[in-house]
Amino acid sequence: MPLLSNLSCMAKNHSIYLVANIIDRKPCNESDHSCPRDKVKFFNTDVAFSRNGTLISRYHKNHLFIEPFMNPADPYEFAVFDTDFGARVGLFICFDVLFAESSLLVEKHNVTLGVMSSWWFDELPGWYSVGVQQAWSIHNGIPLLAAGIQRLEMGSLGSGIYAGLRGPLNYTYSPDGKSKLLLADLSNTSSVDPRYHGDVLNPKQRFLKHADVSDHAAQELEESSGDSRVCHGDFCCSLSYEAEELHDKFVLLAKHGLTNVASYMELGIEKCILAVCESVNGTLCKNFSTKSTTKFTKLQLTAEFTTNAVFPVLASNELALTPKDKWQFETTSANVSTLTLKENGNDEGILQAVLYARKYESDRFIH
């Protein structure tokens, strides 16, 4: 196959490990209960090559996201390979990041470096590409290399190199349609600006999906400092905060249950969110802003979850990832999770603080 040969030569000629996303075509027969009528299956696939050009790993995507011409891996796959620099690499693709198998790579297969290819569709609050990428790396405590496609008209962008609890080492989130090469030294612990220096920081337009939060418990912040608590059933979200002045409309949101994904499946979730909201026709939180000028001197978001699969996101003005040395995330053995802005923290306006948990066992398909 010319494509695989070209990728193999690229890895060998440059003496690098190479992971690429391709479509894999496989014949099947009647003994396979999921075999299509044309006896051919197509898989969203990542392939990995060693420095000498050898194909060392192949992964078929487990969890499809509106990919009608693709087949999911059956049974679920775990693609892992070892490197000559001491890392054990685990592969997953895009939507997989929201499911248990991507974390089981770490828990059950001892992966020390995640590699993710992606065609992501941004959704606010919280579920936008680089926010999700960083959250996975923090939750699992290992580095992640994430490469995302640029399709501006679909709200698809965002790539990064993340170092677990240390946060991003280099990331890009710029709707400019340009390909970029991100480089980082995972062993470097010095504090550097992780944003790709060619990014457009204040774009004229973004394409974002705004989540319907009409079924969330919600409470607007009225004062510039104080404590707030909102509950959705037995699940409660607490906030303690101080700001010189609230220049933006912030709403505290809580949700326990299911969230609809593209009208074809529902994911089990628990969400605790502080976000800048826009009211439309009397609806408290219809749209989510990408701009904030409110600077908090204190911010602590806390919730007691029923699972330990909790993922944190803290975003500043224009959805920039708030520098990780400005905030911390902690989870106790009782699944009480806290996101805290450190003293003398961020100089930028805080846009969203999100703690979202996944209840994998509650997931279900609608059709």
Question: What is each residue range found by the language model?
Answer:
Residues 149-367:
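C-terminal beta-strand edge segments of enzyme domains
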Residues 1-52, 120-143, 149-153, 265-272, ...:
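Cys-nucleophile CN-hydrolase/nitrilase-fold catalytic domain and related Cys-dependent amidase chemistry
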Residues 2-16, 24-112, 118-135, 155-156, ...:
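Active-site catalytic loop in hydrolytic enzyme cores
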